[in-house]
């Protein structure tokens, strides 16, 4: 289903709760993704047809392992993740164009969501500037 939305949205971030995050995107052949090949261990698929069409990338990031007893409140964890991704994209608007910067963006977002899961608040106060 997400692939069917790519003509309308270049990047999709699908929050999967305790299963992690799925990024589905189309990127230009001028990005670093052009030199990547699908990597099952890396949890991503890179597909590009012939010619000058965009590349489609599906990348799964598993959730951080967190003992059940350390989870205080799930409210706001997904919102925290999305807010962190958006804040990273403000700093680096081309962050999705490079596999390493995408990994860093999602890792930071998952770390922020983990802080919120361990907090009694909807957003962990430790995330405030």
Where is each model-derived feature located?
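Conserved phosphate-binding/catalytic region of the ribokinase-like
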Residues: 1-129
